[in-house]
Amino acid sequence: MVKAIAVLKGDAGVSGVVHFEQEADAAVTTISWNITGFEPNTEHGFHIHEFGDVTNGCTSSGSHFNPFKKTHGSPEDENRHVGDMGNVLADANGVAVGSAKDPLIKIFGPTSILGRTVVVHAGKDDLGRGGNEESLKTGNAGPRPACGVIGIAN
């Protein structure tokens, strides 16, 4: 099993940790998260971006990780970016905790997420259903209050 981690930080009070686990090259990856500092009862876009560059905060992490040149979608869609992880839901205390399994996200191989950046967005991801061109690129999720580079975990 290989494990990876991204420690999310930003300048808006949002912070957290995202864990990735994959048993073998062809296996589904398990993602789990614990993110704090949101407004209560809100949803936030949650993506893997193409670069592990946070020199200018989260904006230098580039676009969603999209090695297969697809349009933006939900994690359940066949036509989606590899980095499309949907939304995280903050509870009444502004904390988002959850997990998911994803067949496209890989720690191993040519489409590895290692060295890329997890970004949590200020707004809800419309999952590519917003009816405009930006929806098909970003899900209209808005600014990037926190992010973290994905690295190998212990």
UniProtKB/Swiss-Prot annotation:
InterPro entries: SOD-like_Cu/Zn_dom_sf, SOD_Cu/Zn_/chaperone, SOD_Cu/Zn_BS, SOD_Cu_Zn_dom. One of its GO terms (molecular function) is superoxide dismutase activity. Substrate binds at R144. Coiled coil: none annotated. Its cofactor is Cu cation; Zn(2+). The keyword NADP does not apply. GO terms for cellular component: cytosol; mitochondrial intermembrane space; nucleus; superoxide dismutase complex. Its EC number is 1.15.1.1. Binds 1 copper ion per subunit. Binds 1 zinc ion per subunit. Destroys radicals which are normally produced within the cells and which are toxic to biological systems. Belongs to the Cu-Zn superoxide dismutase family. This is Superoxide dismutase [Cu-Zn]. It comes from Eremothecium gossypii (strain ATCC 10895 / CBS 109.51 / FGSC 9923 / NRRL Y-1056) (Yeast). The gene is SOD1.
